[in-house]
Regions:
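Asp-based, Mg2+/Mn2+-dependent phosphohydrolase catalytic module
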Residues: 1, 6-17, 21-24, 40-60, ...
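Conserved phosphate-binding loops in N-terminal lobes of ATP-dependent enzymes
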Residues: 28
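Conserved phosphate/oxyanion-binding catalytic-loop motifs
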Residues: 35
Length: 249
């Protein structure tokens, strides 16, 4: 969402119009963000205030995907979580026990990050804990520039503990599976708009989903030119305004 339909606290008016036109044409809309620092309720409220009028079941985060994996594949196992209080609350409300001595470590985008949190995560992973991460994004775009994201935090743990995490969210198959389950459509009938080559666009390229890059967020035209052919989007547009004009005139 961030960098595609809004940037920080600034809404893209053309995005509001585009989403409205999609719904009125009978198309299914799903807002998917890798930013797990906030829970889905936060995004519902934010999008409502911005004028998007999100409906039930239209918002999915990498935190949702991670929680679903833990509940389905690691039931009852405690987790050490490096995340915001909102993400901690989402985990506990989903029935996941948080512990400082767990056999599973999950790192995420944590704006309350401390050295103690990093040290604990590294020690646990170094001693054999399973290492998971909600999403691989290195930077989060804001109105004031980029700030370190989940991937940067995971890189710290990997450098210290020597273990690469299993990632969820975009661009991984677990995310696509949840998208298909929620929308009821197969990958052939889904199109993703996003601003990042290595998450949004990679989701499409790796999983048979049409991928359209918008230049309102992290990626520049130079980045696209420098990317390998297999990693380039199916289409590049300046913003969702271009998509709105192309589809609806």
């Amino acid at each position: 969402m961030d960098g595609t339909v809004f940037l920080g606290g600034r809404v893209f008016d053309f995005a509001v119009r585009f989403i409205k036109n999609l719904r009125e044409s009978g198309r299914r809309v799903l807002f998917f963000t890798n930013n797990a620092s906030h829970n889905p309720e936060y995004y519902y409220d934010k999008l409502r205030r911005m004028g998007f009028d999100p409906q039930d079941g239209e918002i999915l985060t990498s935190g949702d995907v991670t929680v679903e994996f833990l509940k389905s594949h690691r039931p009852g196992k405690p987790v050490y979580l490096v995340g915001t209080p909102e993400l901690e609350r989402q985990f506990t409300e989903s029935g996941i026990t948080l512990s400082d001595s767990a056999d599973i470590v999950v790192t995420s985008f944590d704006t309350t990050l401390t050295y103690k949190k990093l040290d604990t995560a590294c020690r646990l992973v170094r001693n054999g804990a399973e290492y998971l991460s909600t999403h691989p994004d290195f930077n989060c775009p804001t109105e004031d520039g980029f700030i370190p994201d989940s991937g940067a935090i995971a890189a710290f743990v990997t450098a210290s503990a020597g273990v690469t995490p299993t990632y969820f969210g975009k661009p991984y198959r677990t995310a696509v599976t949840m998208m298909c389950e929620i929308t009821g459509f197969p990958t052939d009938d889904i199109c993703i708009f996003g601003d990042r080559l290595y998450t949004d666009i990679a989701l499409g390229k790796k999983n048979g989903v049409t991928a359209i890059l918008v230049l309102t967020g992290e990626t520049t035209e130079n980045d696209v030119s420098a990317a390998a052919e297999a990693d380039r989007p199916d289409f590049v547009i300046n913003s969702l305004a271009d998509a709105d004009r192309a589809i609806f005139g």
